């Protein structure tokens, strides 16, 4: 990718060019991609620059590579999240999980699925291949960014809520019985989606379709871009970054660290006290016997809980770092090299962004043997080829033994993992 050296409006520019303009500032060159959802194509970014004189040329190999990656993520993510949602919606699946965790998993699968279905095709078409004109109208522009941000908020908040649910279930099981009723969980998840929609409302007033041609009439000048002052755009970006990344990341990191420490203690107690560990909060505790195989499962759970936090940071941190570049890099610091870096960094970070919507079903299958069994059974029902591969004798699970003054279902032990 390169920025052509000639500036818009320089001598020799044909006067009849509809994109001709005397001057185009850095603000226009960065405003659209500064929100993190538009490409760095300069013919779109600069108000009236002739595409032949000031352009960002992404080589065809990069476009093909990004397209191949996006298509792979789209197929894996769509299938994985669809099967996950279908699995969690089945009556038998809900009975097997016997907790409210399936509501959180289902909500997260829905937000990931919507992110892939609503955002990826538009981005691949209008921000990777066809930078301008914007093809979906003003309502499409505002709606695209609104829905994309709403799904982003929903995904982040759903991951955080799942961590809260697991924290209560593992560290405070008695409180969890009271606080995590099905009706309360449904209301809580509904509140998450409502909050996500409200947090995304500013995008309806921030983005819009504009014609950046010199006469304001040329169809090739239509772009989807911020329509408000740059300073306000930067505020919206920073608020979005805090609410959709920093806040959820802190919640996830803190709670999963506590959960991992708790599971580590349970594993140590089980090893030292003959497979018996203590579970409970400050005011009530009880001892619980764990089958030998559960010790290894708990160790695995500690590792995977850490992997969940790492995956969230790896997939989302570069994406938000790129968006914040627009806020904190001054006009004078933007160079042709930085433009090049930004454009390709955009492709990498957005690919990671979509990885986060694809990887969750994979993590569920890695973490929970119970979920994996149900997931594969559902996939076998939907896919005849997979059904033939999975023909084998059924097996039964032994219930976990519990010794305490309280009664705890065997599945409560299995559900210490996601």
From Swiss-Prot:
Region listing for Neurotensin binding, in residue ranges: 321-344
A Gene Ontology cellular-component term: dendritic shaft
UniProt keyword Transmembrane helix present: yes
GO biological process, one term: positive regulation of gene expression
Location of this chain's protein in the cell: Cell membrane; Membrane raft
Membrane topology recorded in Swiss-Prot or TrEMBL: Multi-pass membrane protein
InterPro entries, alphabetized: GPCR_Rhodpsn, GPCR_Rhodpsn_7TM, NT1_rcpt, NT_rcpt
Tissue note: Expressed in prostate (at protein level). Detected in colon and peripheral blood mononuclear cells. Detected at very low levels in brain.
Predominant location category: membrane
Stretches of the chain found on the membrane's Cytoplasmic side: 89-102, 165-184, 260-303, 365-418
Lipid positions (S-palmitoyl cysteine): 381, 383
Domain of life: Eukaryota
Extracellular face of the membrane: 1-67, 123-142, 206-234, 326-343
PTM annotation, UniProt: N-glycosylated.
Keyword Disulfide bond among UniProt keywords: yes
Glycosylation sites: 4, 37, 41
A GO molecular-function annotation: G protein-coupled neurotensin receptor activity
Keywords: Cell membrane, Disulfide bond, G-protein coupled receptor, Glycoprotein, Lipoprotein, Membrane, Palmitate, Receptor, Transducer, Transmembrane, Transmembrane helix
Residues annotated as transmembrane: 68-88, 103-122, 143-164, 185-205, 235-259, 304-325, 344-364
Pfam annotation, one family: 7tm_1
PANTHER family referenced in this protein's UniProt entry, alphabetically: G-PROTEIN COUPLED RECEPTOR, NEUROTENSIN RECEPTOR TYPE 1
Protein task: G-protein coupled receptor for the tridecapeptide neurotensin (NTS). Signaling is effected via G proteins that activate a phosphatidylinositol-calcium second messenger system. Signaling leads to the activation of downstream MAP kinases and protects cells against apoptosis.
Domain writeup: The ligand binding pocket consists mainly of extracellular loops ECL2 and ECL3, as well as transmembrane regions TM6 and TM7.
Family: Belongs to the G-protein coupled receptor 1 family. Neurotensin receptor subfamily. NTSR1 sub-subfamily.
Assembly notes: Interacts (palmitoylated form) with GNA11.
Protein name: Neurotensin receptor type 1
């Amino acid at each position: 990718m390169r920025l052509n050296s000639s500036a818009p409006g320089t001598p020799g520019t044909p006067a009849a060019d509809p994109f001709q303009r005397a001057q185009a500032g850095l603000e226009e060159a960065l405003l659209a991609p500064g929100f993190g959802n538009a490409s760095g194509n300069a013919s779109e970014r600069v108000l009236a620059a002739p595409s032949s004189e000031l352009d960002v040329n992404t080589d065809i190999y990069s476009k093909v590579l990004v397209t191949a990656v996006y298509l792979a993520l789209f197929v894996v993510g769509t299938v994985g999240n669809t099967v996950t949602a279908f699995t969690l919606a089945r009556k038998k699946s809900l009975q097997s999980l016997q907790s409210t965790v399936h509501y959180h998993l289902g909500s997260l699968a829905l937000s990931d699925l919507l992110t892939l279905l609503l955002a990826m095709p538009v981005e691949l078409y209008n921000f990777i291949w066809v930078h301008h004109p914007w093809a979906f109208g003003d309502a499409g522009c505002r709606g695209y960014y609104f829905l994309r941000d709403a799904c982003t908020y929903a995904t982040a908040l759903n991951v955080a809520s799942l961590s809260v649910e697991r924290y209560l279930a593992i560290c405070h099981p008695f409180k969890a019985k009271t606080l995590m009723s099905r009706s309360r969980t449904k209301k809580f998840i509904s509140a998450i989606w409502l909050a996500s929609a409200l947090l995304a409302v500013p995008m309806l007033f921030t983005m819009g379709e504009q014609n950046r041609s010199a006469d304001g009439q040329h169809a090739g000048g239509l772009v989807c871009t911020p329509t408000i002052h740059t300073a306000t755009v930067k505020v919206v970006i920073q608020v979005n970054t805090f609410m959709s990344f920093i806040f959820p990341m802190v919640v996830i990191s803190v709670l999963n660290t506590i959960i991992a420490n708790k599971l580590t203690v349970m594993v140590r107690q089980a090893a030292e006290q003959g497979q018996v560990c203590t579970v409970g909060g400050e005011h009530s505790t009880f001892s619980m016997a764990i089958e030998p195989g559960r010790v290894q499962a708990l160790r695995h759970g500690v590792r995977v809980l850490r992997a969940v936090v790492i995956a969230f940071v790896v997939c989302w941190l570069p994406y938000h770092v790129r968006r914040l570049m627009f806020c904190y890099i001054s006009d004078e610091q933007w160079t042709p090299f930085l433009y090049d870096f930004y454009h390709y960094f955009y492709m990498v970070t957005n690919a990671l962004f979509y990885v986060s919507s694809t990887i969750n079903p994979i993590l569920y299958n890695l973490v929970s043997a119970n979920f994996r069994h149900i997931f594969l059974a559902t996939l076998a029902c939907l896919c005849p080829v997979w059904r033939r591969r999975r023909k084998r004798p059924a097996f039964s699970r032994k219930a976990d033994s519990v010794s305490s003054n309280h009664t705890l279902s065997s599945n409560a032990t299995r559900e210490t993992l996601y």
